[in-house]
Design a protein with these regions (language model features):
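Alpha-helical segment proximal to the catalytic Tyr-Lys
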Residues: 118, 162-167, 220
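Residue(s) in the substrate-gating loop at a strand-loop-helix junction
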Residues: 134
Length: 251
């Protein structure tokens, strides 16, 4: 069987109506999966099956999983993609804003994962849960401290769930760097080329491809891992740049 053929598989993508989430949903759909996406507002374009859900509410997270099982008969893959945060200076941001950021980016994925595990652990073949993190959780994140802390916590959550829920359920993280067109930030192409070794941001489809890999039999022994999709990271500004002309790195 083709390892990236998801025909007959049931997949849920939270925050799957735009940006990276929409690309992930489209990739699984193209691979033959039946896909259910959720968001707090309806999508503006045609997408796979959609249900409105605010996954910060554990009851709505459970209802999302139940809706998937009702449609597909089983649930094979959950991609916890919903998240994000506005720019906020840590010294002056309100406690309420910080709490909401952590709730959306850390607590909500736990709600969805708990509901998914209840189903996956009881079905033949188990299942896969993928957390969409961020490089903001791996290095200082000025202007988004609470977001970076939540994403760091999300990776730790994934490793803990991977240990607790093995062998039936595999849990991994995807850790994107700058992504073009995801709507979360405005990228300066020159700054990205100067900072990222590969010389450009990722495309949403490139993040989606890694999700396909982690959900497939090709990653059957991979759990508790964090796969960086960041083009080589970020060249430290205080080190001499040894990489050659910028133009050579963006091709």
């Amino acid at each position: 069987m083709e390892p990236l053929d998801f025909t007959g598989r049931g997949v849920v993508v939270t925050g799957g109506t735009r940006g990276i989430g929409a690309a992930i949903a489209a990739a699984f759909l193209a691979a033959g999966a039946r896909v259910l996406v959720c968001g707090r507002t309806p999508p503006s374009s045609v997408v796979p099956d959609f249900v409105p859900a605010d996954v910060r509410d554990p009851a709505q997270a459970a209802a999302l999983v139940a809706a998937a099982v009702d449609r597909f008969g089983r649930l094979d893959v959950v991609v916890n993609n919903a998240g994000g945060a506005p720019s906020a200076v840590a010294a002056s941001a309100s406690p309420r804003l910080h709490a909401k950021i952590v709730e959306l980016n850390l607590v909500a994925p736990l709600h969805v994962a708990q509901a998914a595990n209840t189903v996956m652990k009881q079905q033949p073949g188990g299942g896969v849960i993928i957390m969409v993190g961020s490089v903001s959780g791996t290095r200082p994140s000025p202007g988004s401290a609470a977001y970076g802390a939540a994403k760091a916590g999300l990776h730790h959550l994934a490793t803990s769930l991977a240990a607790e829920w093995a062998p039936a359920v595999r849990v991994n993280s995807v850790v994107p760097g700058p992504v073009a067109g995801d709507g979360s930030l405005r990228l300066d192409p020159a700054a990205v080329a100067r900072t990222v070794p590969l010389g450009r941001p990722a495309t949403p489809a490139e993040v989606a491809d890694v999700c396909l890999l982690l959900a497939s039999p090709l990653a059957s022994y991979v759990t508790g891992a964090a796969v960086a999709v960041h083009g080589g990271g970020e060249w430290p500004g205080y080190l001499e740049d040894l990489r050659g002309p910028t133009a050579d790195r963006s091709t």
